[in-house]
A protein has these predicted regions:
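Conserved catalytic or metal-liganding residues and their short signature motifs at active sites
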Residues: 1-230
Length: 230
């Protein structure tokens, strides 16, 4: 009888140990913070899980083995969605899996500054900050049909580009970016600014040309008002 009780006791202890180990691993991957800092991940089409993991600096990972185990067991290459993602401080390893699998992108700052009178320069500036390549940008800047929807043509598209910082998704298309530009353009050209430009005998497009000629001495869009007579 005592032997039977001993067997039951040992079996119960083994179950507790196993459940504790499983629970501990689950907690480590799903609840326990595993990052001491922030990391930006850029996922391009056809990237592998290992290539994405390689973008997380070892210096911010508390338990690297746990991260590898959780991500490799929760993600496969085909789960990855292109985009810019941010690993936040104090998040558990499983957050990386959920973020990448669900496409929880974080926007990036698209900075447009300096002279905007050369399409090649604009194309390179945008392509250097986005998933787009410079050829895609250049094609859009020469697309008569696309530009017509904004009230512009390839030869005056420069007037649509207002130097500023824009929050966009890294995977944004050129149409998305031009939508942002048009919104900024329309927001700037209030009745008051239109009247100021008209008083000087200038159209909004002509004001933009003048602003470019002086090399956009400020990257802050509202300073166009000084050129428009403000």
């Amino acid at each position: 009888m005592k032997t039977w009780k001993l067997i039951v006791l040992v079996a119960a202890l083994l179950v507790i140990v196993i459940l504790g180990a499983v629970g501990g691993r689950w907690y480590a991957g799903n609840r326990k913070p595993n990052f001491t800092g922030k990391a930006d991940l850029y996922v391009r089409p056809q990237m592998t899980v290992d290539e994405v993991l390689a973008q997380i600096p070892d210096s911010i990972v508390i338990n690297h083995r746990n991260l590898i185990h959780v991500v490799r067991n929760g993600l496969i290459d085909s789960d990855l969605k292109p985009g810019h993602y941010v690993v936040e401080k104090n998040k558990p390893s499983v957050y990386v899996v959920r973020m990448l699998k669900n496409g929880w992108q974080s926007p990036v700052n698209l900075v447009l500054s300096g002279t905007m009178r050369q399409k090649g320069r604009i194309a390179r500036k945008i392509a250097n900050q986005m998933m787009l390549d410079s050829a895609e940008v250049a094609d859009a800047l020469n697309d008569s049909s696309l530009l017509a929807s904004y009230g512009f043509i390839p030869s005056d598209v420069f007037s649509l580009i207002i130097p500023d910082t824009y929050q966009v998704y890294w995977t944004a298309s050129m149409k998305d970016i031009l939508d942002k530009q048009k919104a900024a353009y329309d927001a700037f050209w209030t009745d008051e600014n239109l009247a100021k430009a008209e008083a000087q005998g200038l159209t909004p497009k002509q004001v933009s040309i003048v602003a470019s000629i002086v090399k956009s001495e400020s990257n802050y869009a509202p300073e166009y008002s000084s050129i428009a007579g403000g």
